[in-house]
Curated annotation (Swiss-Prot):
This is Non-specific ribonucleoside hydrolase RihC. It holds the Pfam family IU_nuc_hydro. It comes from the Bacteria. PANTHER family: INOSINE-URIDINE PREFERRING NUCLEOSIDE HYDROLASE (PTHR12304), NON-SPECIFIC RIBONUCLEOSIDE HYDROLASE RIHC (PTHR12304:SF15). It comes from Shigella dysenteriae serotype 1 (strain Sd197). InterPro entries: I/U_nuclsd_hydro_CS (IPR015910), Inosine/uridine_hydrolase_dom (IPR001910), IUNH (IPR023186), Nucleosid_hydro_RihC_nonspecif (IPR022976), Ribo_hydro-like (IPR036452). Hydrolyzes both purine and pyrimidine ribonucleosides with a broad-substrate specificity. GO terms for cellular component: cytosol. The active site is at 233. Its EC number is 3.2.-.-. The lineage of its organism: Bacteria, Pseudomonadati, Pseudomonadota, Gammaproteobacteria, Enterobacterales.
Length: 304
């Protein structure tokens, strides 16, 4: 039986790979997409997501979400993904539009109508998820779990300690981590290992139309290089759903720093249980890199 999922995203070049896997992995049933400001503005992430859905002829509803973090000024990752978020490929024109309600309400409505609890997957800042949990707490029993790409038990990537998706809206992340829902965190500890090799990248143009498109986007992606390999951060959240055997997880208490002058956005992961608090997050700490690199070509070959 396919696993029903809703995907909250901020495309973003590596988001495009994660979206492809979410659509085409036979184990998954992607039923709703929502966008959030993150890698670029929410107007751009929405445009990019609609372009991808049209490219794959995927009839999946999409709702536009939060344009700004809960309490602080927005930040983006255009230096990594380019000003548009997905430069490098000429997508064809289309007439697709987002739903007429905000993302968190679209998630609420879809959850309440679902015949079984749904897995939420968030691969951008957690603003939409925090709005859902704070404004619609009645939805919690309808959430099977939340799988996120975000955070780190060690070093950061936008500050010495903080990962971008959490640092972009620490207050939202703190709200989500305190919510009591089941959370799986695929952070930098595993995503920095999730590298597509130069040899594989070179084969993409001959794979299929998706391979050609991704190869064009990757030439503008700044999380690694075509010569050294590219990190597929967001894809790890989808990979865990399909191949959890590739990941080593540990239940930990995780808090999000929102006040520190130098540490705002840090996920404080209590790996050794020093604080004596019960675990609230399943933290991915290691990745079977060889297995991941074998799985990616399998799923992208289906993305025709």
């Amino acid at each position: 039986m396919r696993l029903p999922i809703f995907l909250d995203t901020d495309p973003g070049i590596d988001d495009a790979v994660a979206i492809a896997a979410a659509i085409f992995a036979p184990e998954l049933d992607l039923q709703l997409m929502t966008t959030v400001a993150g890698n670029v503005s929410v107007e751009k992430t929405t445009r990019n997501a609609l372009q991808l859905l049209h490219f794959w002829n995927a009839e999946i509803p999409l709702a536009q979400g939060a344009a700004v973090p809960l309490v602080r000024a927005p930040r983006d990752a255009a230096s990594v993904h380019g000003e548009s978020g997905m430069a490098g490929y000429d997508f064809v024109e289309h007439n697709r539009k987002p739903l007429g309600i905000p993302a968190f309400l679209a998630i609420r409505d879809a959850l309440m109508c679902a015949p079984e609890p749904v897995t939420l997957v968030a691969i951008g800042p957690l603003t939409n998820i925090a709005l859902l949990l704070s404004q619609c707490p009645e939805c919690k029993p309808y959430i099977r779990r939340l799988v996120i790409m975000g955070g780190s038990a060690g070093r950061g990537n936008c500050t010495p300690n903080a990962e971008f998706n959490i640092a972009a809206d620490p207050e939202a992340a703190a709200c989500v981590f305190r919510s009591g829902i089941e959370i799986v965190m695929c952070g930098l500890d595993v995503t920095n290992q999730a590298i597509l090799t130069p040899d594989y990248l070179a084969t993409l143009p001959e794979l299929n139309r998706t391979g050609k498109m991704l190869h064009a986007l990757f030439s503008h992606y700044r999380s690694g290089s075509m010569q050294s390999g590219l990190r597929m951060h967001d894809l790890c959240a989808i990979a865990w759903l399909v191949r959890p055997d590739l990941f080593t997880l540990k239940p930990c208490f995780v808090a999000v720093e929102t006040q520190g002058e130098f540490t705002s956005g840090t996920t404080v992961v209590d790996i050794d249980g020093c604080r004596g608090k019960p675990a609230n997050v399943q933290v991915a700490l290691d990745l079977n890199v060889k297995g991941f690199q074998q799985w990616v070509p399998e799923v992208l070959a289906l993305a025709s």
